[in-house]
Amino acid sequence: MSKFWSPFVSGLVPYVPGEQPKLTRLVKLNTNENPYGPSPKAVEAMRAALTDDLRLYPDPNSDLLKHAVAGYYNVQPNQVFLGNGSDEVLAHIFHALFQHDAPLLFPDISYSFYPVYCGLYGIDYEMVALDEQFQIRAEDYARPNAGIIFPNPNAPTGCLLGLDAVEQIIKASPDSVVVVDEAYIDFGGETAITLVDRYPNLLVTQTLSKSRSLAGLRVGLAVGHPDLIEALERVKNSFNSYPLDRMANVGGAAAFEDREHFETTRNKVIESREALVEQLRGKGFDVLPSAANFIFARHPQHDAAALAAKLREQGVIVRHFKQQRIAQFLRISIGTPEQHQALLEGLSDI
């Protein structure tokens, strides 16, 4: 601890991102990146934007991308908020909407950035336990709160909460903001964006990192009632008025316009996921039902941490979490058939 730090800094427990190895020969199945490239139209749009105009600031409102998102989801532009990745969007949400007297609620097994934001902004929170099957129970959230947030599909489990249950949670807390974090929704679920016109307390976040294959671009979004969006805009413009650069604006807009590439690559990921689930079950793994671009699996006869270490020795990286309830699980990102073959061969050698 430095004498120059503000007092609260020493108490922060930062988020630990998944490993980004420098060795390119490794089979990387640990950070849920899309194994297939982004839309060629998005790449071309970004190349076309590489002009002398880079000397100028980007559009602070990101109107091009905002209108593309609004058109895709059939909402109004003033219902859309954009940020430098969904993590920044979530950070603004915690800052703008969750600082109240009652606790924020989120699952005990979910995105590990949530308690980090609470620590950063001094937000009181309670973690709500998943059931024995690692599912969210909507009725558990019908209690006093100052807000609710949960990933759907959940991360790192991959389990999906049906839209009826999502709506049940929203209805039970009409005076609190309910945030549905849909980073992985395109791989097997139905978006709650269809509900935002019905519920002024609903905010839905998404990212272009997963199903749009643009993790390196850092584009996140939120869709909700204009009152909620205005709060986020106020925080954003008190922090960074230019979160999205010129490449992100044009590339993101083009990605939303290229529906054919999106559908093709998404379906390939889903097909690969289902095939890998069956292959792992054939090797004795228990695999949770997944609606994401990853699976959550455990082997009853092998320690998960040891498995992850042995796979790494063979050039395959998967994600292991030390949290008690899930310490015997591995999260495995969906890759190409060739990457899956390397994983399966590595497991056969263990």
Curated annotation (Swiss-Prot):
Pfam families: Aminotran_1_2. One of its GO terms (biological process) is L-histidine biosynthetic process. GO terms for molecular function: histidinol-phosphate transaminase activity; pyridoxal phosphate binding. CDD domains: AAT_like (cd00609). The modification N6-(pyridoxal phosphate)lysine is found at residue 210. The keyword Nuclease does not apply. It is an enzyme of class 2 (transferase). Its EC number is 2.6.1.9. The keyword Amino-acid biosynthesis applies. PROSITE patterns: AA_TRANSFER_CLASS_2 (PS00599). InterPro entries: Aminotrans_II_pyridoxalP_BS, Aminotransferase_I/II_large, HisP_aminotrans, PyrdxlP-dep_Trfase, PyrdxlP-dep_Trfase_major, PyrdxlP-dep_Trfase_small. Keywords: Amino-acid biosynthesis, Aminotransferase, Histidine biosynthesis, Pyridoxal phosphate, Transferase. It catalyses: L-histidinol phosphate + 2-oxoglutarate = 3-(imidazol-4-yl)-2-oxopropyl phosphate + L-glutamate. Its cofactor is pyridoxal 5'-phosphate. Pathway: Amino-acid biosynthesis; L-histidine biosynthesis; L-histidine from 5-phospho-alpha-D-ribose 1-diphosphate: step 7/9. Homodimer. Belongs to the class-II pyridoxal-phosphate-dependent aminotransferase family. Histidinol-phosphate aminotransferase subfamily. NCBIfam families: hisC (TIGR01141). This is Histidinol-phosphate aminotransferase.
